[in-house]
């Protein structure tokens, strides 16, 4: 299977550059199994589309302002993108510079303080920050939000609220779990009234999510690692939902990635640690019955994942419909409610 199998042409004007004024006003394409027709709805219609006893699983990661700028003591400019906080004022980062920094090198940060290069881990570096607050707290005012590269503007104050889900809690992501951005408190309240249950996992979206697949032969692709936590409470909610014939619905591909990584011996088990799972057609997703997901980049691993879930032909048919109907694409764009193709 090749990366080029997942290419499609997208008019640039359909790439959403900013969120809508109201989170749940985003459009929602309902994609049932073929040959049923697509329907064009809005995210705020979800209470009508779901059933009492359904379980929505959200990713409660919180985005950190992970982009920093500075200069080496030699004078060269440096851009830093934090991949993961390691504790003890240390972080694993990506560094953009004209020359790779060496261990022991010091970066003077534009927002005050400095960072020492402790070493290298593949494409990443480990830095120790010398700043006057705990690193996580310092980043809140010193860091810049790392909007995806296809959003062609600088982040503003509004992005600090809108590029964050309303249920974000566990600090550690460098990108938002974007399907969750569509949910606001009024919608969550209406879903509760409908009898829909909620659960949470944590997956800290890493900088690798911005990296393109660099090989055409997908068997040679090395998937990036991300930290996840699937707790015992969520596992019990899933078990109870299944026992009562409810549906487990993932809010986003990050939730699917976390749940699939926590499957053991035919069932979901509590799990905390790193995942490197790569889901593409041929893999059967067993942990969820439907998912809400945004529209993904051509040739991306996320497009491959949803193709594994609903069938590549069905997904590409849905994307053609979305382009024709002028849906908004990518992180600040619209969403789909996606159901799997029946087996056989």
Show which residues each predicted segment covers.
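Surface-exposed, charge/polar-rich loops and edge strands
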Residues: 1-344
């Amino acid at each position: 299977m090749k990366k080029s199998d997942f290419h499609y042409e997208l008019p640039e004007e359909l790439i959403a550059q900013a969120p809508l004024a109201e989170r749940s006003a985003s459009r929602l394409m309902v994609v049932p199994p073929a040959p049923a027709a697509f329907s064009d709805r809005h995210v705020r219609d979800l209470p009508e589309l779901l059933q009492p006893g359904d379980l929505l699983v959200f990713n409660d990661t919180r985005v950190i302002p992970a982009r920093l700028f500075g200069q080496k003591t030699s004078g060269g400019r440096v851009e830093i993108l934090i991949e993961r906080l390691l504790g003890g004022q240390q972080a694993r980062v990506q560094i953009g510079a004209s020359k790779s920094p060496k261990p022991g090198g010091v970066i003077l940060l534009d927002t005050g303080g400095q960072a020492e290069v402790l070493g290298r881990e593949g494409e990443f570096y480990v830095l120790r920050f010398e700043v006057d607050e705990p690193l996580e707290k310092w980043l809140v005012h010193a860091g810049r939000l790392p909007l995806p590269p296809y959003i062609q503007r600088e982040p503003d104050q509004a992005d600090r609220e809108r590029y964050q889900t309303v249920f974000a809690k566990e600090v550690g992501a460098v990108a938002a779990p974007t399907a969750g951005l569509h949910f606001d408190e009024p919608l969550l309240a209406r879903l509760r009234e409908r009898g829909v249950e909620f659960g949470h996992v944590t997956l800290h979206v890493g900088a690798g999510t911005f990296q393109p697949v660099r090989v055409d032969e997908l068997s040679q692709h090395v998937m990036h690692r991300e930290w996840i936590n699937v707790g015992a409470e969520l596992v019990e909610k899933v078990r109870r939902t299944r026992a009562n014939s409810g549906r487990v619905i993932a809010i986003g591909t990050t939730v699917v990635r976390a749940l699939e990584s926590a499957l053991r011996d035919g069932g979901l088990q509590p799990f905390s640690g790193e995942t490197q799972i790569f889901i593409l057609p041929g893999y059967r997703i067993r942990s969820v019955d439907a998912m809400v997901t945004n529209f993904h980049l051509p040739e991306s691993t996320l497009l491959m994942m949803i193709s594994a879930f609903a069938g590549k032909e069905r997904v590409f048919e849905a994307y053609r419909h979305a382009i024709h109907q002028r849906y908004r694409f990518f992180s600040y764009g619209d969403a789909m409610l996606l159901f799997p193709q029946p087996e056989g």
